[in-house]
Design a protein with these regions (language model features):
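N-terminal alpha-helical scaffold/docking segments in eukaryotic complex subunits
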Residues: 1-54, 62-63, 217-221, 229-253
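Amphipathic alpha-helical scaffolding segments comprising HEAT/armadillo-like alpha-solenoid repeats
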Residues: 1-12, 32-46, 65-79, 98-110, ...
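Alpha-helix N-cap/helix-start positions at coil->helix boundaries
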Residues: 17-20, 35, 50-51, 83-84, ...
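Alpha-solenoid HEAT/ARM repeat scaffold
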Residues: 20-23, 39, 54, 87-88, ...
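Alpha-helical adaptor scaffolds
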Residues: 122, 146, 151-158
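Long, ordered, amphipathic alpha-helical scaffolds
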Residues: 180, 185-196, 200-253
Length: 253
């Protein structure tokens, strides 16, 4: 069924409680990608109603034909007084995967609302190769909110293959995180980079049912890690978890 632009905008604005319907309509508007769609979305961004501003930001996020103009509008909306609006704006900027948004997103990374900072950790995950984005993500890995630290550590450790001494140091630091999920993500990030500093943590947790640890154990028992595993045994002793890792590694030779 073909919907008019009026009908699609009506769904996006009015169906706040039906997220599936909203995003179906938003995707149709993205597919149209006309100047009319851009202008009407920009108008929504100037509304006094927060839900309308959210709708406008969601639409502008992927209008590639008007990316420069959309970025300018979205960046200005980071000063919005409603954290829910700012969160959506951050996600919209993240959709653009444009290094020109990094400085604006860096400012949002110190927002008072944790949901905004969490969104920044998502928005920058594909830009970590840029040193500015890396710095922001490493800062978010130390955030006071557990969910933000977890998201940033997951993005840096598992979603990105970018590898620098700073990233490894930040992941190693998070091995001591008070939250087990964050620490597990850090262990996986180090294991993916074949960093032997993850071995003691993984050995101590290998009997757990945690999915991240199972994946980390698979990474750290790659055939080229046997020497490091044996060094760890010399340092730590023949502990059960380490013995398990060594046996798994030898079985892969």
């Amino acid at each position: 069924m073909v919907h008019s632009v009026d009908e699609l905008f009506a769904v996006v604005v009015r169906e706040a409680d039906d997220d599936d319907a909203r995003w179906v309509a938003i995707r149709e508007l993205h597919a149209l990608g006309t100047r009319e769609v851009f202008e009407r979305a920009a108008q929504l961004c100037r509304s006094s109603d927060a839900s309308a501003r959210i709708a406008g930001a969601d639409i502008l996020g992927q209008l590639s034909a008007y990316a420069d103009e959309a970025t300018s509008i979205l960046t200005s909306m980071l000063e919005d007084g409603d954290p829910g609006v700012v969160e959506c704006v951050v996600h919209a900027l993240g959709q653009q995967q444009d290094v020109r948004t990094i400085e604006a997103l860096a400012r949002a990374a110190i927002h008072d609302a944790s949901n905004v900072r969490w969104a920044v950790a998502t928005a920058l995950e594909d830009l970590i190769g840029d040193e500015r984005a890396e710095r922001v993500m490493l800062s978010l890995m130390r955030d006071g909110d557990t969910s933000v630290r977890d998201r940033a550590t997951f993005a840096v450790g598992s979603l990105s293959d970018h590898d620098t001494p700073r990233i490894r140091a930040a992941l190693f630091e998070r091995l001591r995180d008070d939250d087990r999920c964050v620490a597990n993500e850090a262990a996986l990030g180090l294991a993916r980079r074949h960093d032997a500093r993850a071995i003691p943590y993984i050995a101590g947790a290998v009997e757990s049912a945690d999915g991240e640890i199972e994946e980390a154990a698979d990474e750290i028992t790659a055939p080229d890690m046997l020497t490091e595993l044996l060094k760890a045994r010399d340092a730590l002793g023949d502990v059960h978890g380490l013995k398990t890792l060594i046996n798994r590694c030898r079985a892969r030779l």
